[in-house]
């Protein structure tokens, strides 16, 4: 727990991009809770959690139906928090971990090592409208955002309000400033080889997530030809490139942006 920085907040607020860029700048290990979705669901099923069993049994076309409370319960928001903590504790002791996700458990993380990114109501409204989500999904997002904000307030976790006025680099700078004391001890300690290994690890986490989805008995098709965005593995601290690649190609790796192979 003392070897991690924790970034929480609702979906779509920019956590993943901020954490990715912070990790790449400083040569840190990235942990994204989304990449453990199917591992966590399997743990919940093994533990006999009724909401997990109910979701798994529903036809995929019906999983978006139901009340916001029912959908939130089946998202396993509460149950996944301790799983996230267990995951991070199991990671190697070095380097420092940047852990991000909507399931970050505000009540279980050290507040001096945490920062929650919370959108303003106006920004959330604009983003939900832009996505064109059906009403049940939109209601779930609104409830999840309110739940995460309430959890942060109760745990007294520091909050960065996101209103859309700052670009991503400016937001990363603010998060970097918040964690400056911890980052100062890490910057410059990772070799190029270590940076590349950490980027490979993060990309393979995405590969595992997608393969985990297509391994479900109700999923059709194969993950190998699915395209996703992967981090360039050049290891340059200034590199922010992300490469569209199929899962199969990214798994074979390494993934490089044009001209970044050296």
What are these language model-derived features?
Residues 7:
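Hydrophobic anchor at the beta1->P-loop junction of P-loop NTPases
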Residues 11:
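The conserved Walker
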Residues 15:
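Conserved lysine of the Walker
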Residues 18:
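Hydrophobic positions on the alpha1 helix immediately C-terminal to the Walker A/P-loop
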Residues 26-44:
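Short beta-strand-centered segment that lines the nucleotide-binding/catalytic pocket of NTP-utilizing
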Residues 39-96, 210, 214, 224:
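ATP-dependent small-molecule kinase phosphotransfer cores
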Residues 109-157:
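A glycine- and Lys/Arg-enriched "phosphate-lid" helix/loop adjacent to the NTP-binding pocket
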Residues 147-201:
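NTP-dependent small-molecule kinase module
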